[in-house]
């Protein structure tokens, strides 16, 4: 059962669902809009070896970032020209990780799904790849996987980037996501790189 606007207000007001900060203007008919934070991660590895720690740079923006497609040629001169012409803090090509401003806590009988905004899809910008599912009992900020597929796109800190759709489960989970020992991203309050390496460690322990 998907929560309507009335349900979302009820769950937030009764503190069964926590959204911090909460803006009543961001409540839709059956969703809640979330906004872009200031922290990002850009991977440095030429190859993603998923059994190893992934090398990356973590950085912050003051106002805006230009996201270019992977095959978009960038060099120092082009980057500086883009920064000056479009007044952006940072210019990157390829995929990068971002995070929402919003910190969310779900009870064990509510799960959620993140969806990118249709307006972004219409300029061929995706803000999540496969990680749109949020398990019951999750606590933390939502990580975004950002890719531009056509032309460079300028994103602004604090702009609405997607929405959360909340669903009531038939029964509460016995162990919520953030209470499971093997949950890798429980309580995340900042952008986090992939911890898939830990999957292999868990398998070896078993």
Curated annotation (Swiss-Prot):
GO molecular function, one term: dCTP deaminase (dUMP-forming) activity
Any one of the GO BP annotations: dUTP biosynthetic process
Catalytic machinery residues: 145 (proton donor/acceptor)
Coiled coil: none
Binding site for dCTP: 117-122, 135, 143-145, 163, 177, 184, 188
Annotated site (Important for bifunctional activity): 132-133
SUPFAM superfamilies to which the protein is assigned, alphabetical: dUTPase-like
Keyword Lipid metabolism part of the UniProt annotation: no
Subunit structure: Homotrimer.
Matching NCBIfam families: dCTP_deam
Function in brief: Bifunctional enzyme that catalyzes both the deamination of dCTP to dUTP and the hydrolysis of dUTP to dUMP without releasing the toxic dUTP intermediate.
Name of the protein in its database record: dCTP deaminase, dUMP-forming
Organism name: Methanococcus maripaludis (strain C6 / ATCC BAA-1332)
């Amino acid at each position: 059962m998907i929560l309507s606007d009335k349900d979302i207000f009820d769950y937030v007001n009764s503190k069964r669902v926590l959204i911090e900060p909460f803006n009543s203007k961001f409540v839709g008919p059956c969703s809640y809009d979330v906004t872009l934070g200031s922290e990002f991660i850009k991977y440095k590895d030429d190859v993603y070896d998923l059994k190893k720690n992934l090398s990356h740079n973590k950085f912050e923006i003051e106002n805006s970032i230009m996201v270019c497609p992977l095959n978009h040629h960038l060099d120092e001169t082009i980057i500086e020209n883009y920064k000056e012409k479009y007044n952006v803090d940072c210019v990157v090509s390829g995929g990068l990780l971002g995070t929402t401003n919003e910190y969310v806590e779900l009870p064990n009988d509510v799960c959620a799904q993140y969806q990118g905004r249709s307006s972004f899809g219409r300029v061929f910008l995706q803000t999540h790849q496969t990680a749109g599912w949020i398990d019951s009992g999750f606590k933390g900020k939502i990580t975004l996987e950002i890719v531009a597929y056509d032309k460079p796109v300028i994103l602004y800190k604090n702009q609405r980037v997607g929405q959360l759709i909340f669903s009531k489960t038939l029964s509460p989970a016995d162990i919520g996501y953030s209470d499971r020992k093997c949950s890798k991203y429980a309580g995340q309050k900042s952008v986090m790189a992939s911890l898939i390496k830990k999957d292999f460690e868990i398998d070896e322990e078993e």
